[in-house]
Amino acid sequence: MCLQQLVISWVSLVWLASPLLAIWELEKNVYVVELDWHPDTPGEKVVLTCDTPEEDGITWTSEQSSEVLGSGKTLTILVKEFEDAGHYTCRRGGEVLSQMLLLLHKNEDGIWSTDILKKKEPENKNLVTCEAKNYSGRFTCWWLTAISTDVNFSVKSHRGSSDPQGVTCGEATLSAERVKIEQREYKKYSVQCQEDNACPTAEETLPITVVVDAVHKLKYENYISSFFIRDIIKPDPPKNLKMKPSKTPQQVEVTWEYPDSWSTPHSYFSLTFSVQVQGKKKKRSNTLHVDKTSVTVTCQKGAKVSVQARDRYYNSSWSEWATMSCP
């Protein structure tokens, strides 16, 4: 990951004395130092270069200390703790010449830290969940965090690795929804992405990769999710759920339609449906699976009929339920 993301800035060069090259540019003037988090680790030696053609009269300071750290166009620092990260500024007299921010990415015993995000379900390995309503190449990813302040997320995505194809993602936004896990409330962030040259009918051979960069104060982490669109399909619920009496007492004919967001033509992108009847005592009847958009069921007063949809030809996720009370 480090070598793939390394960007060398010829204007304001930041490099590492270590041959591991464990520093890279996250965005302009923001750098991530990848650090072994162990008491015996000597730390990483980093050389910062001031963005100026001048050579003399330059001093360096940081937000962690009010003292002058050094003078000259370059400053060598040893990064070992979070106290060594933060903003570094070079000045000449009272003029700020350039400023850069160092973030730390912790590696403990060969495992990168994952402290910022929270799993909704312990058995789920992914901290980032992605879903698509259809095969248009548009999908939504979301994640949870308990952190309220000083947290920022950015998202990038592509399909394939050797010759990556473009996927455009918007800005991560905070949802009004709050999720409770083990009596604790978590905030939910989400992002919308669109494959640039999606072909809904084409067979997928290369997965899409989504990378979420997370920054909390001076800590950096990243989270990667890789998938095929067919694996993350979750249709919207069926629409226009209706009932009409049948000739047989206490039976009704239930009808519905494909959701508007589902791919067309429906003869090619077909759905299958699950139908359940819930009585007053909230006991489920046997589940009915049908491919058509109607079914006749026994429906006593006070019961509820629910219908959900799934891709007919691929074992992806079921939609949420569409529900209607029996007359």
From Swiss-Prot:
A GO molecular-function annotation: cytokine activity
Chief place of localization: secreted
InterPro entries (alphabetical): FN3_dom (IPR003961), FN3_sf (IPR036116), Hematopoietin_rcpt_L_F3_CS (IPR003530), Ig-like_dom (IPR007110), Ig-like_dom_sf (IPR036179), Ig-like_fold (IPR013783), Ig_sub2 (IPR003598), IL-12 (IPR050676)
Record domain Fibronectin type-III: where: 237-327
Disulfide bonds: C50-C90
Domain Ig-like C2-type: 23-106
Segment forming the signal sequence: 1-22
Function: Cytokine that can act as a growth factor for activated T and NK cells, enhance the lytic activity of NK/lymphokine-activated killer cells, and stimulate the production of IFN-gamma by resting PBMC.
Recorded family membership: Belongs to the IL-12B family.
Name under which the protein is recorded: Interleukin-12 subunit beta
